Amino acid sequence: MIPSAYPDAKEMARLTARMLLEIHAVHFNAKDPFTLSSGLPSPTYIDCRKLISFPRIRATLMDFLTVTVMRDVGFEAFDNIAGGETAGIPFAALVAERMALPMTYVRKKPKGYGRNARIEGAMGEGERVLLVEDLTTDGGSKLSFVDAIRETGATCGHTAVIFYYDIFPETTKTLGDHGVALHSLCTWWDVLAEAKQQGVFDEATLSEVEKFLHNPRKWQEANKK
């Protein structure tokens, strides 16, 4: 069911950040940084997958994501909702239910042969597909999923995520050059603002996180092990 009334984008961002902090999906550690898949250090880490275990928060954020897409793109803009393996699958299913649309998912690697080898579920020629994921950092990982969708003969010009890093300036260009618009609920800046408001991390940690967000490349270079 799609809610008939909902907060504006700014309030949804604040509430999303608050909920992510409440379930401890957000981790800040400047003294012992996390290691990203790239091998580079980061004082921040977020685990959106935890959301599936919190029904009230999960439902609220899926309502937010659904109305965000409808507000930004339209109420009748899509024919199919696709999730990326694996983190995007539960969220795609929940959004598809709210939008009363078919749901599919995209494999990271093909299974079998043919142009639908990476698609599970029914996706037809010419269908307008929304790609749903948990988060995006620099946008690069989304392109493989988009390409797999387009190989079926469907179109994919939009991706919706719960969380967008918003610290790498090339992200929107990377997606835009590929013909993909990004829709998100909140960013690290929203989380930082809410963390400061709640006082859930000490000042030294928040200061170091803010330095990272303003210039992640410089921070990573200075904190390489």
Curated annotation (Swiss-Prot):
Alphabetized InterPro entries for the sequence: OPRT, Or_phspho_trans_dom, PRibTrfase_dom, PRTase-like
Residue positions annotated to bind 5-phospho-alpha-D-ribose 1-diphosphate are 107-108, 111, 133-141
Task: Please give the pathway this protein is involved in.
Answer: Pyrimidine metabolism; UMP biosynthesis via de novo pathway; UMP from orotate: step 1/2
Q: Where does orotate bind?
A: 137
Coiled coil regions in record: none
Catalysed reaction(s)?
orotidine 5'-phosphate + diphosphate = orotate + 5-phospho-alpha-D-ribose 1-diphosphate
Q: Which GO terms describe its biological process?
A: 'de novo' UMP biosynthetic process; pyrimidine nucleobase biosynthetic process
Recorded superkingdom = Bacteria
On subunit structure and binding partners, the annotation says: Homodimer.
Q: What does this protein do?
A: Catalyzes the transfer of a ribosyl phosphate group from 5-phosphoribose 1-diphosphate to orotate, leading to the formation of orotidine monophosphate (OMP).
Family label: Belongs to the purine/pyrimidine phosphoribosyltransferase family. PyrE subfamily.
**Name of the protein described by the UniProt record:** Orotate phosphoribosyltransferase
